[in-house]
Amino acid sequence: MLVRMVSTALQIAADRLAALLTGGGGGLADPGGGHLEFDAVVRLRPLTRSVAPPEVWAVDGGQAVVADARCLQLVVARASRTRFCRGVCELEDEGELRAFLLGGKENRAVAVGLGLGIADDAAVDLNLLRDHEEWVAVDRCVEEASAGAMILVDGDLETDWRVPPSWMSGLLARASSRDITVAAVTKRSSLSRGGAPLLGCLEIDAVHELGPRAMWWAPIARSRAGARVVAARLDADAPYAFRVDLSPGADPERALSAMSALCDDAGFPGYPYPLTVADRLAACPGWLRQDTWFEVDDLLDRAGVPHDVRQRAFADRHDLMERF
């Protein structure tokens, strides 16, 4: 019989991983760096589907590196919006594809042009730019949405660390004053229980406590902006539960019951369908990056930049090692 040799380091890591995944308890934490105040006890609660909000907006962002010279980067970011009224999609807005030049002194010029209270000397990267575009789009939705509407956001209700917390608090306060619920859905959550992924633990607990096809929710924490953070399985056929952040003033069970009515699409059970549309609109696939570079290359040519200068500035020399 062939016996596979396992290194000591790998065995130690596997043993530790096994202990974390099967530990069954421990405190809640957010290794992702969120500023959350966790509930003392997390209790699963059954969820019953109601009717979808009459007006639903969804926002998602996209980003891409078009050209990378390491010391300089040409990047693009955008945020897309969609609006559903009584189940009918009435708006698909890809959003403006905004280009930014990053690197060295260029970063300050970019930071100065941003809003959301971002400091002029803030460190700028592509993640911040995408976050900025998304929250600007959410702010527009709050201004345009009708009373009773729900605005869905990809991610959570915590801004990038370079955006002052007061900006998010102000946004959510404006939404609440207009009877608008802002709900953020996180596809990849860093929340943990005893070091193990929290959502996976709750999914297993729910099967034992409520049954394999039960819809459920569980309050978890509050954010520094006052948002209610919960875990929720929003369709009986959903393979996974999600972290959902709900704006202050929203009744969690009522909001989740209404949101679940948006989560019965056969292709994406358990995930709000309007967000899948926004995700598709915001995507920045390879062909888009290539088309954008062709436009930039043409503009550089018109500006008198020689072809060999353009080629050598953005050549991927590491690619030389990956030809074989």
What are these regions (language model features)?
Residues 54-64:
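Two-metal-ion RNase H-like nuclease active-site motif
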Residues 58, 79, 152:
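Generic enzyme active-site microenvironment
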Residues 64-109:
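Acidic, metal-ligating active-site segments
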